[in-house]
């Protein structure tokens, strides 16, 4: 197993600098990560550094609260794609989900999916922010995400009170089935953490510790 190809090398902190993003992109090229996951203002920079590689540019939409309007999420997603992003991680509207307004939740995902996929094979991941949800809400969010035409469910923003757990990843995988993406993010800091998430059903890992995870994995010759 090539662990690097399962990692979205991530830097989303609000005080990230251009030089830190450049370092992130260089590390992604060196290690062969699946993507870099960055804030929207850095998409141009990342694209300029990675356009001749197989490392994807991933950005976040409605981040980190997910409370933006549908229209603003669509605009933000399309703008990112026009600038070179080929993967977008959108935060689900947790308030609407917990209010039981499932039509709204499904519609917002559908609208973003429809808008970005008109530009090509853009991967859409939906961040559930599982730390705020009951198990029943996690299942419903997974079902809505799949029905709406997205490509992945993702556990967390990394900005909430909790991150990915083995139990949540198992539940998400069980709900979406085999032919769908599950991304574990938040609190995945070591190769052992990554291995546990993959064994639970994740096929993508979001982590700011991508280099550490990859080096530990290779050193331990994990499979």
UniProtKB/Swiss-Prot annotation:
InterPro entries: Aldolase_TIM, DeoC, DeoC/FbaB/LacD_aldolase, DeoC_typeI. The active site is at 89 (proton donor/acceptor), 154 (schiff-base intermediate with acetaldehyde), 183 (proton donor/acceptor). Keywords: Cytoplasm, Lyase, Schiff base. One of its GO terms (molecular function) is deoxyribose-phosphate aldolase activity. Signal peptide: none annotated. Pathway: Carbohydrate degradation; 2-deoxy-D-ribose 1-phosphate degradation; D-glyceraldehyde 3-phosphate and acetaldehyde from 2-deoxy-alpha-D-ribose 1-phosphate: step 2/2. One of its GO terms (biological process) is carbohydrate catabolic process. It is found in: Cytoplasm. CDD domains: DeoC (cd00959). GO terms for cellular component: cytoplasm. It is an enzyme of class 4 (lyase). It catalyses: 2-deoxy-D-ribose 5-phosphate = D-glyceraldehyde 3-phosphate + acetaldehyde. This is Deoxyribose-phosphate aldolase. It comes from Thermoanaerobacter pseudethanolicus (strain ATCC 33223 / 39E). The gene is deoC.
